[in-house]
Amino acid sequence: MGSMTLLFFVEHVFIFCMIFWLLTWVAEYFFKSKNNKQKHQFYECGIRALSELNIQINLNFSIVCVFLILYDVEFIFMYPFFFNFFLVNAGAFLVFFVFLFFVFYSLVYDSVQNSLALQL
């Protein structure tokens, strides 16, 4: 019974792979890539724009994104501590509070440097 199950699995994986292989051929036939002059040119730094749009994005938005990611990761590190609050020893409390100190220190440092002040 075990060898039949393995054979059945291998057959289905093979059929699945063949279907997707055929679908790639069909997709390549119907959806051909468009060639343009800039597609095959060399570039030194960045990609040349296809249009003359000059959109300026405010740097404060990217700074806010970096802060959100930074503090989100720090709170993810603190998340397991709250579920094991009664199971940890004094050493874990010390490590947690040192980590919490650095989180709040970085928040105070950001506010002193006016990094958190948005100027839209």
Curated annotation (Swiss-Prot):
Catalytic activity: a ubiquinone + NADH + 5 H(+)(in) = a ubiquinol + NAD(+) + 4 H(+)(out)
Compartment(s) of residence: Mitochondrion membrane
UniProt-listed Pfam families: Oxidored_q4
Enzymatic class: translocase
Transmembrane segments: 6-26, 63-83, 85-105
Protein origin, superkingdom: Eukaryota
Gene3D superfamilies registered for this protein in UniProt: NADH:ubiquinone/plastoquinone oxidoreductase, chain 3
MF terms (GO), sorted A to Z: NADH dehydrogenase (ubiquinone) activity
Signal sequence range: none
Gene Ontology CC: one annotated term: mitochondrial membrane
InterPro entries in UniProt: NADH_UbQ/plastoQ_OxRdtase_su3 (IPR000440), NDAH_ubi_oxred_su3_sf (IPR038430)
EC number, UniProt record: 7.1.1.2
Keywords, comma-separated and alphabetical: Electron transport, Membrane, Mitochondrion, NAD, Respiratory chain, Translocase, Transmembrane, Transmembrane helix, Transport, Ubiquinone
Topology with respect to the bilayer: Multi-pass membrane protein
Biological role stated in the UniProt entry: Core subunit of the mitochondrial membrane respiratory chain NADH dehydrogenase (Complex I) that is believed to belong to the minimal assembly required for catalysis. Complex I functions in the transfer of electrons from NADH to the respiratory chain. The immediate electron acceptor for the enzyme is believed to be ubiquinone.
UniProt family annotation: Belongs to the complex I subunit 3 family.
Name this protein carries in UniProt: NADH-ubiquinone oxidoreductase chain 3
Source species of the chain: Paramecium tetraurelia
Gene coding for it: ND3
